[in-house]
Amino acid sequence: MERPVRVKAWVEENRGSFLPPVCNKLLHQKQLKIMFVGGPNTRKDYHIEEGEEVFYQLEGDMLLRVLERGKHRDVVIRQGEIFLLPAGVPHSPQRFANTVGLVIERRRLKTELDGLRYYVGDTTDVLFEKWFYCEDLGTQLAPIIQEFFSSEQYRTGKPNPDQLLKEPPFPLSTRSVMEPMCLEAWLDGHRKELQAGTPLSLFGDTYESQVMVHGQGSSEGLRRDVDVWLWQLEGSSVVTMEGQRLSLTLDDSLLVPAGTLYGWERGQGSVALSVTQDPACKKSLG
């Protein structure tokens, strides 16, 4: 059975994994992939997927380069800020020394493909691309990147039309990319609702990712096909699952695996996140 994990203590214990050349380590790898990423790590490649990604910066800032509605844009995610990247947005994370960030994504459906692209200079013309079924991005990216650096396209800076798809396997997103938000400031602005026991959504209901903030109160749930990740931001709570009571105190996290019935009691002063990513709720990329 899953046990609570204190996030900052876990990060400290695994700090060596956030340095080059690895730069990341998974906390959970089930239906939800909960990972922490460090640096320095600067990249030229852009990743594209049919699911969404949640970013939160624990230590220091990062830069996320995106292709938004046909134009390049730099999104700075500062320490303490949270951000939701829509599905189908080409993105290239740039991370710096002495930084650590949380990234949450989900297991791919068997029908979904990921893409890795390089563009010609600062244009939106595709120089090189590979589409693949993603099982472990950490091990699958390196061979593709090496293939690019050994390619004629890399040497000449010119694409080979015969190796580019006329159309990608799925349409790129036409949604605008949101601005990152300071989580602490958001909490301060919604304390009355949270104290009244009203769960609040950070990003609304137009995404498959549901990042909910819970104040005091109780709830129970059973998500048959998706994991639920809980993170205690303030105060304490108690989760009951599989006949056991698990106490969560400040900075504790807990993964509730898919198909697990759980109850959640949150006392006065409790503030906690719950995160799910349900592909059954996928939105149109248009």
Swiss-Prot record:
Keyword Cytoplasm listed? The answer is yes
Using the UniProt annotation, give all residue ranges assigned to the region (Linker): 161-177
Report the cofactors: Fe(2+)
What's the EC number here? 1.13.11.6
What pathway is it annotated to? Cofactor biosynthesis; NAD(+) biosynthesis; quinolinate from L-kynurenine: step 3/3
Q: Which UniProt keywords apply?
A: Cytoplasm, Dioxygenase, Iron, Metal-binding, Oxidoreductase, Pyridine nucleotide biosynthesis
The record's catalysed reaction(s) read: 3-hydroxyanthranilate + O2 = (2Z,4Z)-2-amino-3-carboxymuconate 6-semialdehyde
List where in the cell it is found: Cytoplasm, Cytosol
Its recorded name reads 3-hydroxyanthranilate 3,4-dioxygenase
Species assigned in the record: Bos taurus
Tell me the organism's taxonomic lineage: Eukaryota, Metazoa, Chordata, Craniata, Vertebrata
